[in-house]
UniProtKB/Swiss-Prot annotation:
PROSITE patterns, A to Z: RNA_POL_BETA (PS01166)
GO cellular component, one term: DNA-directed RNA polymerase complex
The protein's name: DNA-directed RNA polymerase subunit beta
InterPro entries, per database record: DNA-dir_RNA_pol_bsu_ext_1_sf (IPR042107), DNA-dir_RNA_pol_bsu_external_1 (IPR019462), DNA-dir_RNA_pol_su2 (IPR015712), DNA-dir_RNAP_su2_dom (IPR007120), DNA-dir_RNAP_su2_hyb_sf (IPR037033), RNA_pol_bsu_bac (IPR010243), RNA_pol_bsu_CS (IPR007121), RNA_pol_bsu_protrusion (IPR007644)
Function: DNA-dependent RNA polymerase catalyzes the transcription of DNA into RNA using the four ribonucleoside triphosphates as substrates.
Cited HAMAP family: RNApol_bact_RpoB
SUPFAM superfamilies with a match to the protein in the record: beta and beta-prime subunits of DNA dependent RNA-polymerase (SSF64484)
Keywords: DNA-directed RNA polymerase, Nucleotidyltransferase, Transcription, Transferase
PANTHER family per UniProt: DNA-DIRECTED RNA POLYMERASE I SUBUNIT 2
Record text on subunit structure and interactions: The RNAP catalytic core consists of 2 alpha, 1 beta, 1 beta' and 1 omega subunit. When a sigma factor is associated with the core the holoenzyme is formed, which can initiate transcription.
Family the UniProt entry places it in: Belongs to the RNA polymerase beta chain family.
GO molecular function, a single term: DNA-directed RNA polymerase activity
C-alpha cells in the first residue's frame, strides 16, 4: 500500500502498478477542437472559396477578363463583450466578433485593395468547454461516424458478390464489384452496375491493351494442370524456345502451345491476363459490339479477338444509357455527368482523412502493382509508398481496388470446403481426366461451368465446382483467407469534434453566400468607390451557425446535475445525429462492444434505453488525432522489459502487436517476471513468451470512462450493474453537507479538478484574505519569497467564488473556500470547493452505516429503511433553485403593468411585495396560503377591453388608481407544491437587454431556493447499480444497533446482491468500516482493488479493540456482527454484514413528482385533459384500467370516466350545473374523441352514420 495525494487529502492506495502517464486534461478535446476552428478552420473555409471572381461562371475566360476577384487573407477573433455569468442572467449568447482581412483585386489593372471586414458574432467556448446560447449552458457532443475511405465487403443478395466501395466525405459512392459467378468485374455507379472496363476507358485507359496489362497473373510452366486449365488465356509476354519466338504478346494460349511450353526447360513461368480480366473484356465486347460470335461454331483461336473495337465514345454512351435510360445519350452530357459524379471537386470530396484511408488501404496493392505491372525490382518497390494527395478519385485508385478483389476471390472459397471430402476428390478427378481435355468454356465463367457439371456429371454444388478449379489450378492455395472490412472496427470510424461540426456547417452555408458575393462583385466599376464590407454580408450565415448551436441534435442542453454529469457530457460520443445512425436502427453489431474500443471508448457507460450502444463515453486516456481517429497510449516493451516510453496507437495500428495488461507482474527495473504472459492481439487473447510482447497498458483504468473508474471494486461487479452505477452517479444531487467517499478509487480528485468547479491556485503563494465570496493569494517566487511589483505593491491573485447559482437541472452551484488565511498554496492546489466536492475531491453522496438484513418487509423489492438521524443531521438534504419569470408586454388594449396594486387580492398575499409589485429577496414563499391562493411573486395587471369612459369613471380612476380600472390579474404566482426562499430577483427592460423581444417592456426573473430533505419515495443508490426507494423513516432508537449501542443508519435488502452479482458493494462496506475505525481514507483503483484478506483481517483486529467483534470468527473473519433490535433489545437470529457504504441521493425526488388535479387545461382537438405535471394534467385511464372496471361490472363509473370526466364537453358542463344545484347528474353524451374519429373517417371519404336502437339516424353534431 502507498499514500497518494488527492486534492487536500491523502489516501492509502492499494494500487500496485506504476503509472508513468499522468491523467490528461479531460476536457481538452472540446477546448482544443474549437480553438483550432477559430484559429485555423474558419480561414480554411474562406480560403476554400477564394478567390471569388465576378465572372466566375465563365470558366473559359482568361484571368485578366474575369473582372474583379475577392480573396480572404486572414481571420481573427475579438474579445467577448459580456462575461459568461451575465450572459446566463440576461439570456444572451456568449460570443465573440470575428473579422477577416479581405483583398479585392482588379484583374485587368492588377490594382489591389485590402480591408478588414466584420463577419459577425459567433458563440465562444467558456473555460469549462461549454457554450452559453440564449442564457442556457450547452455542450456540443462528439459524433462518431464511419470514416471516408475504401472498404471491402461481401454481400449476399441472391448470391455472393465481393465489392470495394469508395466512401467519400461528400458525393456519390463508387463501387468496384466482382461477381464470382459471372467472373466479371463491374463498377457500381450511382447504384447501377456497368462493366468495369467500360468505365476505365472513360477515365484515361483508352486502349484495351492498357487495361488488360493492369491484370496479369503467372502460371507455373511445369504444371500441366494449370496450363491446360488456362488454355484460351491471353499472353502478356513473348515466349521463346532457345532464342526463337514461338508466341507473341497478345496471342492466345492454345493447347498445342501449352504442351510445347511443358517441354521447354528454361521457362519457369508465363505471364497471362488474369482470367477474370479476360472474361470482363469479353463481356464488354458482348455488351457493346453489334457483331457477336455467339451461336457460331467455336474454333480454337490463336489471336485475341475484338481488341480496341470498343471506343471511348462507345464506353461513354453505353454507361450513360445504363445510368440515365430516360435521356437521349449524348457524348458531352455523358462526359459531364461522369466527371461531376467522381472527379469534380465541387461535387465530390474524399476529404484529407478519406484520402489518407484510401492510400493506407491501397499501400500493399500498389507495391504489387509496381512489381507485376510496372516491372520494378521487388526490393525497390517495397520502399515506395502510395502517396496520392488528390481529394477526388484517381484512375489508379480504382485499378488498385479492383486488383485487391482478386485476392478475396482467390483466397476465400477453398477455405470454405473440406479439401479431403469425397465430393472434392471426385471433382478433381473429373477435371483431370475429362474436363481439361474437352474444355469449351472460359475457366472463370462459373455459370457456364456449373451448368456443364450439372448436365454432364450430376454435380450440384456451385462451391464444389469452384473449389475444384482453385485446387487444380493451384493458384495461391496456401494463402490464408482475408477478412473483409468491418464498419464497427474503430480503425474505420472517426470522431467529429465540435470544431469540425461547426466548420462543416459554416462551409455548407458559405457556399450559398458565395453566389451573393459574386453578384455584388459584378456591380463594381472601380476599386476606389467600393467598400469591401459592403460586398460581404454573411449575417445570415452567422445566424444559421448560431442556429446550429441552438437546434442541432448534437448541441445539447448540458446535463448539470453535478460536476461528474457535466464532465461526462463533454466527453460523450454519439453515433446518432446528422450523417450518423438512426436511433430506431435494429443493428445489434453497431451497438455491441467491439474489441477495438479497448482504451478508446468505455465498454460500460452507455444509456439503458433506445440509445444503448449508440451513446458512449471516451476512455480516460483516449486521444483524438488530426484525422479524428481515436488513439490510446501504451508503454513500449523491449525484450521483455517495460520501458517508460509511451506510444499512442490507432485501433488499426495495434492489430499486429501483442499487448499485455497493466496488472502483469513487473520487477522494479521493469522486467516482466513470468516467462509466459497473457497478451491481446487483435481480438484474440494469447499466452506468449515475454520476449514477444510489444506493448503494455499504461494503467488499469485505461479501458474505462471517468464514471466507471469512480466505482471501487468494479472488477467484482456484473457489467450491467456497473453500467447502472456509472449512469446513476451522474444523477446524484449535490448535497448541503458534502463528504468524500471513505472508499474511493483515487479518481475523485481528477474528476473534480477537471470539472472546472474546484478552484485551483494559478501560482504559488500565501493566502492573504478569505471570505465566502473570494480568496486573495499573495504570490511567491520559486524560493518562497513574497512578490511585489515595481511600485512596491504586493502581486496578488484574486479568485471570485460562485454563490448560489442555478444549474440547468435546478441544482445549486455554490463554491466555498477550503483554505485559511496564512496558508501556503502551491500551483494547482485546490483552494475552493464547488458543488458535490469535499477538500478538492468529488463527493456525490455520504458515507452511511448500513446493515444488510430484512426488516418487517420494509426493504421488499429493493426498498430502503432509513433512520430519522439522517434527517436530523441533514445528511441527504439538498438545495434546489428554480427560476420563475414573467414579462410585461405592450398589448392591443394598452401596456401590461408590474404593480403591487392588484384588484381583489388579500393583504396577506401582498405583504412580501415591494412598491413595484416584485417580491423582496429573503421572503419565504409557499404555494398555498389558503384554499386556491398561491403566493404572488410578481404583481402584474393586464388591461381589459373597455368602451368609452364617462367623466365619473375618470374621477374614480384618478382617485383609486388601478382599482378603478377594469384590469385582469395576470400576476406570476408560485406553482402548486413549491415552497422556498427568494434568493435573487432580476429586473430587465429594453435598456438592459437590447434583444428583449418585440413588444416586451419589462422582464422579471425570481429565483426561489427550496430545501429538500430526505423523504419517503426518494431514490437512493450506491455506486454498484444498487438502487432503491426510501420505504420508511424510522426513529433512530428503533433502528437495529451495534454491540456498542450505535444504531445503523440504513437497512438494505441482502436479496439484492446474489442475483445482481454486484459483490463490490459488500467489499466496499467492509473496507468502509475499516476506514471509519482507523480514520484513514482508502483508494482501490479499478482492477487493483483490495483483496478480501487485506480487508477482513485488519477489520477484525480493529473491531476487537473496540469490542465490536461479536459475531465474527477470529480464524476466518467474515465482517459480520451481532445486531440487536432497537425496539426490543433482543439480538437478531444471525450475525449481519454491517459497514460504511457510499450512498447517493438521486435527482428523482418524490416531492417533485407528486401531483394532483381537480380541473385544469384540456386539449383543443379531442378535449381530453392534458397529461403530466408540467401541463397540470390529469391521470390517464388506460385500456388496462378500463378492463379492471369492466371486470367489476362498474358500468356507471366507467361511463362517467369515459365521458363527463374526460371529453364529453356538454355533459361535463351539465354535470357541473347539476352538482351546484344539488340535482342528479344527467346521462352522459357523446365523447369528443368519438366525434374526432367520425370526422377523420369522413375525411377519408367514408360515409359514417349512427343509428339508435329504434333505427333512427342520430345527428352527431347536435350533441
Amino acid at each position: 500500500m502507498k499514500e497518494i495525494s488527492c486534492g487536500r487529502r491523502t489516501r492509502v492506495s492499494f494500487g500496485k502498478s506504476r503509472e508513468p502517464l499522468p491523467i490528461p486534461d479531460l476536457v481538452e478535446i472540446q477546448k482544443s477542437s474549437y480553438r483550432r476552428f477559430l484559429e485555423e478552420g474558419l480561414l480554411e473555409v474562406l480560403k476554400k472559396f477564394s478567390p471569388i471572381y465576378s465572372q466566375a461562371t465563365r470558366s473559359d475566360l482568361r484571368k485578366s477578363d474575369r473582372g474583379f476577384a475577392l480573396e480572404f487573407v486572414s481571420t481573427r477573433t475579438g474579445e467577448p463583450a459580456i462575461d459568461p455569468l451575465e450572459c446566463k442572467a440576461k439570456g444572451l449568447t456568449y460570443s465573440v466578433p470575428i473579422y477577416a482581412t479581405a483583398r479585392l483585386t482588379d484583374m485587368k489593372s492588377g490594382e489591389m485593395k485590402e480591408e478588414e471586414v466584420f463577419l459577425g458574432y459567433i458563440p465562444y467556448m467558456t473555460d469549462r468547454g461549454t457554450f452559453i446560447i440564449n442564457g442556457a449552458e450547452r455542450v456540443v457532443v462528439n459524433q462518431i461516424v464511419v470514416s471516408p475511405g475504401l472498404y471491402f465487403s461481401s454481400e449476399y443478395i441472391d448470391r455472393e458478390e465481393y465489392g470495394g466501395y469508395f466512401l467519400p466525405s461528400r458525393g456519390a459512392w463508387l463501387e468496384v464489384i466482382l461477381d464470382p459467378y459471372d467472373g466479371v468485374l463491374y463498377a457500381g455507379l450511382d447504384g447501377k452496375k456497368v462493366n468495369l472496363f467500360l468505365f476505365l476507358k472513360t477515365i484515361g485507359y483508352e486502349k484495351d491493351e492498357d487495361i488488360l496489362s493492369l491484370y496479369p497473373t503467372y502460371l507455373d510452366a511445369d504444371d500441366e494442370d494449370s496450363l491446360l486449365l488456362h488454355v484460351g488465356s491471353i499472353l502478356l509476354e513473348d515466349i521463346y524456345d532457345g532464342g526463337r519466338k514461338i508466341a507473341e504478346k497478345w496471342d492466345i494460349l492454345t493447347k498445342d502451345l501449352a504442351e510445347r511450353i511443358l517441354m521447354i526447360d528454361d521457362i519457369n513461368q508465363i505471364k497471362i491476363v488474369h482470367p477474370i480480366a479476360q472474361n470482363t473484356f469479353e463481356k464488354m465486347l458482348e455488351v457493346v459490339s453489334s457483331s457477336s460470335e455467339e451461336g457460331e461454331e467455336e474454333e480454337e483461336k490463336t489471336k485475341i479477338y475484338g481488341l480496341n473495337e470498343v471506343t471511348v465514345v462507345d464506353a461513354y454512351l453505353e454507361i450513360f444509357r445504363r445510368l440515365r435510360p430516360e435521356e437521349l445519350p449524348r457524348i458531352n452530357a455523358a462526359k459531364r455527368y461522369l466527371h461531376d459524379l467522381f472527379f469534380n471537386p465541387e461535387r465530390y470530396d474524399l476529404s484529407e482523412v478519406g484520402r489518407y484511408k484510401v492510400n493506407e488501404r491501397l499501400r500493399n496493392a500498389y507495391i504489387r502493382y509496381l512489381i507485376e505491372v510496372e516491372g520494378e525490382d521487388p526490393e525497390e518497390a517495397r520502399k515506395k509508398v502510395y502517396n496520392e494527395t488528390s481529394l477526388v478519385l484517381k484512375p489508379l485508385d480504382i485499378v488498385l481496388a479492383s486488383r485487391i478483389l482478386f485476392d478475396y476471390f482467390e483466397r476465400r472459397y477453398v477455405n470454405d470446403f473440406e479439401i479431403d471430402s469425397y465430393e472434392l476428390k471426385n471433382l478433381i478427378r473429373i477435371f483431370k481426366e475429362e474436363y481439361l481435355e474437352k474444355r469449351k468454356t472460359a475457366p472463370y465463367d462459373l455459370r457456364k461451368l456449373v451448368s456443364v457439371f450439372r448436365r454432364n456429371y450430376g454435380v450440384t454444388s456451385d462451391l464444389g465446382v469452384f473449389a475444384a478449379i482453385r485446387y487444380v489450378s493451384n493458384i495461391n492455395k496456401e494463402l490464408p483467407s482475408i477478412p473483409f472490412d468491418t464498419k464497427d472496427h474503430l480503425g474505420n470510424k472517426r470522431v467529429r469534434t465540435v470544431g469540425e461540426l461547426v466548420q462543416r456547417e459554416f462551409e455548407r452555408l458559405f457556399a450559398r453566400a458565395q453566389k451573393a458575393i459574386q453578384e455584388r462583385l459584378t456591380l463594381i466599376n472601380s476599386l476606389s468607390k467600393v467598400s469591401i464590407q459592403s460586398l460581404i454580408n454573411i449575417k445570415s450565415i452567422i445566424s444559421t451557425v448560431n442556429q446550429f448551436f441552438a437546434m442541432n441534435q448534437l448541441s445539447q442542453f448540458m446535463d448539470q446535475v453535478n460536476p461528474l454529469s457535466e464532465l461526462t457530457h463533454k466527453r460523450r460520443v454519439s453515433a446518432v445525429g446528422p450523417g450518423g445512425l438512426r436511433r430506431e436502427s435494429k443493428v445489434f453489431e453497431a451497438r455491441n462492444v467491439h474489441y477495438s474500443q479497448y482504451g478508446r471508448l468505455c465498454p460500460i457507460e452507455t444509456p439503458e434505453g433506445a440509445n444503448i450502444g449508440f451513446i458512449t463515453s471516451l476512455a480516460i486516456y483516449a486521444k483524438i488525432d488530426e484525422y479524428g481517429f481515436l488513439m490510446t497510449p501504451y508503454r513500449k516493451v523491449v525484450n521483455g522489459k517495460v520501458t517508460d516510453e509511451v506510444v499512442y496507437l490507432r485501433a488499426n495500428e495495434e492489430e499486429e502487436y501483442k499487448i499485455i495488461p497493466a496488472t502483469t507482474p513487473v520487477d522494479e527495473e521493469g522486467n516482466i517476471i513470468p516467462e509466459r504472459v497473457v497478451a491481446r492481439m487483435g481480438e484474440d487473447i494469447r499466452l506468449v513468451p515475454k520476449e514477444e510482447v510489444d506493448f503494455m497498458d499504461v494503467s488499469t483504468k485505461q479501458p474505462f470512462s471517468v464514471s466507471a473508474s469512480l466505482i471501487p471494486f468494479l472488477e467484482h461487479d456484473d457489467a450491467s450493474r456497473a453500467l447502472m452505477g456509472s449512469n446513476m452517479q451522474r444523477q446524484a444531487v449535490p448535497l448541503l453537507k458534502t463528504e468524500a467517499p471513505l472508499v474511493g478509487t483515487g479518481m475523485e480528485w481528477e474528476a473534480a479538478k477537471n470539472s472546472g468547479y474546484v478552484i485551483l491556485a494559478e501560482h504559488d503563494g500565501i493566502v492573504k484574505e478569505v471570505d465566502a465570496a473570494r480568496v486573495v493569494v499573495h504570490r511567491t517566487d520559486e524560493n518562497g519569497n513574497l512578490m511585489y511589483d515595481d511600485k512596491g505593491n504586493p502581486v496578488v491573485d484574486e479568485y471570485r467564488l460562485l454563490k448560489f447559482v442555478r444549474s440547468n437541472q435546478d441544482t445549486m452551484i455554490n463554491q466555498k473556500p477550503i483554505v485559511n488565511e496564512g496558508d501556503f498554496v502551491k500551483k494547482g492546489d485546490p483552494i475552493a470547493d464547488g458543488p458535490a466536492t469535499d477538500m478538492g475531491e468529488l463527493a456525490l453522496g455520504r458515507n452511511i452505516l448500513v446493515a444488510f438484513m430484512p426488516w418487517e418487509g420494509y426493504n421488499y423489492e429493493d426498498a430502503i429503511l432509513v433512520s430519522q438521524e439522517l434527517l436530523e443531521e441533514d445528511v441527504f438534504t439538498s438545495i434546489h433553485i428554480e427560476v420563475y419569470e414573467t414579462q410585461a408586454r405592450e398589448t392591443r388594449l394598452g401596456p401590461e403593468e408590474i404593480t403591487a396594486d392588484i384588484p381583489n387580492v388579500s393583504k396577506e398575499l401582498l405583504k412580501n411585495l415591494d412598491e413595484n409589485g416584485i417580491i423582496r429577496v429573503g421572503a419565504y414563499v409557499v404555494s398555498d396560503y389558503g384554499v386556491g391562493s398561491q403566493a404572488i411573486l410578481v404583481g402584474k395587471v393586464t388591461p381589459k377591453g373597455e368602451g368609452d369612459t364617462t367623466p365619473e369613471e375618470k374621477i374614480i380612476r384618478s382617485v383609486f388608481g388601478e382599482r378603478g380600472r377594469d384590469v385582469k390579474d395576470t400576476s406570476l404566482r408560485l406553482p402548486h407544491g413549491v415552497e422556498g426562499r427568494v434568493i435573487r430577483v432580476d429586473v430587465y427592460d429594453q435598456n438592459d437587454i437590447a434583444e428583449l423581444g418585440a413588444g416586451v417592456l419589462k422582464l422579471v426573473r425570481v429565483y426561489v431556493a427550496s430545501r429538500k430533505t430526505l423523504d419517503i419515495g426518494d431514490k437512493l443508490a450506491g455506486r454498484h447499480g444498487n438502487k432503491g426507494v426510501v420505504s420508511n423513516i424510522l426513529p433512530k432508537e428503533d433502528m437495529p444497533f451495534l454491540p456498542d449501542g450505535t444504531p445503523v443508519q440504513m437497512v438494505l435488502n441482502p436479496l439484492g446482491i446474489p442475483s445482481r452479482m454486484n459483490v463490490g458493494q459488500i467489499l466496499e462496506t467492509h473496507l468502509g468500516w475499516l476506514a471509519k475505525l482507523t480514520g484513514k481514507w482508502f483508494a482501490t483503483p479499478v482492477f487493483e482493488g483490495a483483496k478480501e484478506d487485506e480487508i477482513l483481517r485488519p477489520l477484525y483486529e480493529e473491531r476487537k479493540k473496540r469490542g465490536l467483534h461479536l459475531g465474527d470468527d477470529e480464524n476466518n473473519p467474515n465482517g459480520k456482527v451481532v445486531l440487536r433490535d432497537g425496539r426490543t433489545g433482543e439480538p437478531f437470529d444471525n450475525p449481519v454484514v454491517v459497514g460504511y457504504m457510499y450512498m447517493l441521493k438521486l435527482i428523482h425526488i418524490a416531492k417533485e413528482k407528486i401531483h394532483a388535479r381537480s380541473t385544469g387545461p384540456y386539449s383543443l382537438i379531442h378535449q381530453q385533459p392534458l397529461g403530466g405535471k408540467s401541463h397540470f394534467g390529469g391521470q390517464r385511464l388506460g385500456e388496462m384500467e378500463v378492463w379492471a372496471l369492466e371486470a367489476y361490472g362498474a358500468a356507471h363509473t366507467l361511463a362517467e370516466m369515459l365521458t363527463i370526466k374526460s371529453d364529453d364537453i356538454k355533459g361535463r358542463n351539465e354535470a357541473y350545473k347539476a352538482i351546484l344545484k344539488n340535482m342528479n347528474i344527467p346521462e352522459p353524451g357523446v365523447p369528443e374523441s368519438f366525434r374526432v374519429l367520425i370526422k377523420e373517417l369522413r375525411g377519408l371519404a367514408l360515409d359514417v352514420r349512427l343509428y339508435d336502437e329504434n333505427g333512427n339516424e342520430i345527428d352527431i353534431d347536435k350533441y
